[in-house]
């Protein structure tokens, strides 16, 4: 078998996790190139209720005029990242490479089917982040291998002013496990950064969105992946 070509983050001879985070020199595609990050999607969302009058325990953060939103809407998510540095702590190693990334994710809920109020965007959330990834290769039971550990600082905001302003900051500790290219498990545990009572838009947001997340992926083949995401309010 020929050795994997250098500088190719799409080379199938490397594992999916190694290519995604460019954990080895052979998976390196350089810095400041645009990569995909979280799923880029257009989906239909339905529920049995919708929040027409957003409120928060924070003072002056409760809407006064309800909006006639409907329970069916479209959701659009865009997400990209770029590697801004590499080899920070592994510059003397030849088999693995750490990296620093900047990512941006935008998710919009669009009242596409609500012609009565001119189909507005109900909300758009912006999430810039900085992530450091350190490559690992520890054997685990059942043929699993611990492939990386990570630390992320992320800000999330809806970009609005009071009383609808909602934002928070958190640090995330993450890790990724894999069995070859077939199955991947990614875990995240986060801690919200304290903002002070006068600046906190969402005092109880952790009770709603959780404090940890586990993602399981089955790579059916090179084109298709089946995944499930579990969130926990610890």
Language-model-derived ranges and their functions:
Residues 1-20:
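Cleavable N-terminal export/targeting peptides
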Residues 54-63, 70, 87-222, 229-232:
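Outer-membrane pore/translocation modules
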Residues 70-78, 83-85:
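Long, low-hydrophobicity, solvent-exposed regions enriched in small/turn-prone and acidic residues
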Residues 23-36, 49, 63-67, 74:
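N-terminal Sec/ER secretory leader and immediately downstream segment
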Residues 36-58:
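Acidic/polar low-complexity segments with low predicted structural confidence
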């Amino acid at each position: 078998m020929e050795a994997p070509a250098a500088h190719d983050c799409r080379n199938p001879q490397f594992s999916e996790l190694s290519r995604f985070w460019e954990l080895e020199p052979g998976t390196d595609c350089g810095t400041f190139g645009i990569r995909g990050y979280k799923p880029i999607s257009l989906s239909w969302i339905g529920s049995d209720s919708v929040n027409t009058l957003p409120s928060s325990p924070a003072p002056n953060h409760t809407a006064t005029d309800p909006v006639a939103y409907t329970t069916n809407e479209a959701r659009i998510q865009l997400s990209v990242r770029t590697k801004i540095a590499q080899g920070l702590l592994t510059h003397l190693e030849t088999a693995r490479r750490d990296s620093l990334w900047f990512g941006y994710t935008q998710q919009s809920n669009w009242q596409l089917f609500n012609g009565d109020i001119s189909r507005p965007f109900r909300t758009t959330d912006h999430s810039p982040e900085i992530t450091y990834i350190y490559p690992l290769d520890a054997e685990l039971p059942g043929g699993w291998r611990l492939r990386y550990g990570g630390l992320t600082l992320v800000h999330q905001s809806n970009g609005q002013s009071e009383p609808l302003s909602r934002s928070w900051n958190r640090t995330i500790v993450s890790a990724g496990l894999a069995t070859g290219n077939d199955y991947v498990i990614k875990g995240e545990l986060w801690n919200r950064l304290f903002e002070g009572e006068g600046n906190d838009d969402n005092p109880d947001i952790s009770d709603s969105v959780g404090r940890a997340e586990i993602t399981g992926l089955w790579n059916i083949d090179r084109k298709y992946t089946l995944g499930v995401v579990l969130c926990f309010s610890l």
